[in-house]
A protein has these predicted regions:
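Acidic/histidine-rich helix-loop elements
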Residues: 12-21, 44-52, 89-98, 151-163, ...
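Binuclear metal-dependent hydrolase catalytic cores centered on His/Asp/Glu-rich metal-binding motifs
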Residues: 56, 60-63, 75-116, 126-127, ...
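Solvent-exposed loop/turn segments at secondary-structure junctions
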Residues: 12-15, 42-46, 71-73, 87-90, ...
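Short beta-strand-to-coil "C-cap" segments at the C-terminal boundary of structured domains/repeats
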Residues: 202-207
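Active-site neighborhood of phospho(di)ester-bond hydrolases with catalytic His/Asp-centered motifs
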Residues: 5-11, 35-42, 66-69, 117-120, ...
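Short acidic-hydrophobic surface loop/beta-edge motif
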Residues: 69-76, 169-174
Length: 207
């Protein structure tokens, strides 16, 4: 594949088995392929001040780190607003306040008309993304539901509990599409069943 951009939607490192060197080696190869854009996940929040060492190395490698920021990327014909939300675990807010916090962040960005892509680690806040008229959300966090039951889906996901609503694949509501990657890691539960790791390829067509 020859992608125009590569996006990483958090949990580049595992707070339980952290190896920044491995993550940076991957990044150094990825930036040779295409421009890379990155947002944090909960595991980055959980490693404390070590995160800033990781971020510095990402920036040195040429990665664009989006922490509650919006930028515009363009080609010869079209432009896209690319939005990056920091994982809510970086804040001191209680979990039940995280949804309203993310909603306020998006509102305060004063997003313009036009196609908008949001990078956000957390799929469970899909309703917030829909409310803010995001066209495409790229997310992760759910590990594909860890164990997948045929015709039912994932069994468990962080912050969603058993039989999560947003575990993997595409979700559509109003004018918003969300794609949740199963990712390539395991984290706390070191086993996947019927749940192959994946790297998602998205192709956009202008109208």
């Amino acid at each position: 594949e020859n992608p125009d951009i590569i996006v990483i939607t958090g949990d580049l490192v595992d707070s339980n088995h952290m190896d920044i060197d491995i993550a940076i080696k991957f990044i150094q190869q990825a930036v040779k392929i295409s421009p890379c854009y990155y947002v944090t996940g909960n595991h980055e929040a959980w490693i404390g001040d070590i995160y800033y060492e990781l971020e510095e190395q990402l920036l040195d490698a040429g990665v664009t780190v989006l922490r509650d920021e919006v930028i515009t990327i363009s080609n010869d014909k079209d432009s896209i607003q690319l939005i990056g939300l920091d994982d809510p675990d970086f804040s001191d807010q209680a979990p039940y306040l995280q949804e309203s916090m993310l909603e306020a962040k998006l509102y305060n960005m004063n997003l313009k008309d036009g196609f908008k892509i949001l990078l956000s680690h957390r799929p469970e806040f899909f309703g917030v993304y829909v409310k803010n008229d995001i066209d495409l959300v790229l997310s992760g966090h759910a590990h594909g539901g860890q164990f997948r039951i045929p015709f039912i889906g994932g069994v468990i996901a962080p912050n969603q509990g058993f039989f999560p609503k947003y575990d993997a694949g595409e979700y559509h509501e109003a004018n918003t599409t969300m794609i949740v990657s199963r990712g390539i890691g395991n984290s706390i539960i070191p086993v996947r069943i019927n749940n192959r790791p994946e790297v998602v390829i998205v192709q956009l067509y202008s109208q």
